[in-house]
Amino acid sequence: MFKPMRFAAIVPILLMVVASSSIQAAPFPADPPSSSKDQAKDAKLRNDSFAALNSLYASEPKAKEFAGKSKAILVFPNILKAGFMVGGQGGDGVLIERGKVVGKFNLSAASFGFQAGAQSFAQVMFFTTNEAVAYLDKSDGWSVGVGPSIVVMDQGMAKSATTQTLSSDVYVFIFGQRGLMGGAGVQGQKITRIGN
């Protein structure tokens, strides 16, 4: 038996199928080559890293003294930390030697326990020995806390620090928009080279 309501519902669908089959599809513009996307992303990371470094120098003048005594500087301009009970943090950064970017790195970490929300901060690591830089270079993912000795600088330490008495391999400054972050640490972070 013929049901006019079903037929009425099918007619528009059939008309759309016929119409779409006779229309020439306009080509979509090609995506730019991934290399130009990668170059733009790399340029942004480099610019953000130097901006973070300059921001640190402006808020903590002693940091510039550490830069003068460092063999390399690893800058993560934007680390995002988020979670609820189980959390994580991560971000990309660059390794700078003699004022030039010589490599890209990723930082990641997981954390457990009571936590809620998200925050963003920057981290700068001053490598004061060639051995520490070599350890970073040869590591297939550096678990921070294993290998080179590390000191995380807080506001009190930064004010009283002197580059004449550097005894650790790596000095870390963790900071946000309001300056150095107290109580921040690097245990559990893993730093891995990106690309070659």
Could you describe each region identified by the protein language model?
Residues 26-196:
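Small-residue-enriched, tightly packed secondary-structure blocks
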Residues 5, 12-13, 42-45:
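Generic alpha-helix initiation/capping and coil-helix boundary signal
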Residues 10-14, 67:
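Residue-level detector of transmembrane insertion/anchoring sites
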Residues 1-11, 21:
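Bacterial N-terminal signal peptides that target proteins for export
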Residues 16-25:
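C-terminal segment of classical bacterial N-terminal signal peptides
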Residues 14-17, 39:
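Helix-centric, low-specificity signal for extended rod-like, repetitive segments
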